[in-house]
C-alpha cells in the first residue's frame, strides 16, 4: 500500500487574494458592456406577445435574445421574420 500523500502539492489558500477577487465581483456593473437590452419584466411576467416583441427587437439588432452573445443576422433569420413571424405569433396565441 502506498503512503504517497497526493495533497502535498496543493498550495495553501491566501484569504487576502480571495477577498480581493470577491470585491471585484461584488463591484461589477449591473449590465456588462455590450449586453442586450433586458426588459424590466422577467420572462415569467411577460405575455407571449411581449416576449416575441423583445425577441424580434434583438434579432433586428443582430443579437439573440435573451442571450448576451452578439450574432449577425443570417438570411434565414430575415426570411423567417417575413414568412414565419405571423404564423408563429398565431400559434402561440392559440396555446395561451
Swiss-Prot record:
Keyword line: Host-virus interaction, Inhibition of host innate immune response by virus, Inhibition of host NF-kappa-B by virus, Inhibition of host TBK1 by virus, Inhibition of host TLR pathway by virus, Viral immunoevasion
Keyword field contains Coiled coil: no
BP terms from Gene Ontology: symbiont-mediated suppression of host cytoplasmic pattern recognition receptor signaling pathway via inhibition of TBK1 activity; symbiont-mediated suppression of host NF-kappaB cascade; symbiont-mediated suppression of host toll-like receptor signaling pathway
Cystine connections: none
Annotated region described as Disordered, given as residue ranges: 1-45
Region feature Inhibition of host cGAS-STING-TBK1 signaling pathway, mapped onto this chain: 30-96
InterPro entries: ASFV_DP96R (IPR003670)
Comp. bias intervals (Basic and acidic residues): 1-20
Record function comment: Inhibits cGAS-STING-mediated type I IFN expression and NF-kB activation by inhibiting TBK1 and IKBKB/IKKB. Inhibits host TBK1 phosphorylation.
Family of this protein: Belongs to the asfivirus DP96R family.
Identification of the protein by name: TBK1 inhibitor DP96R
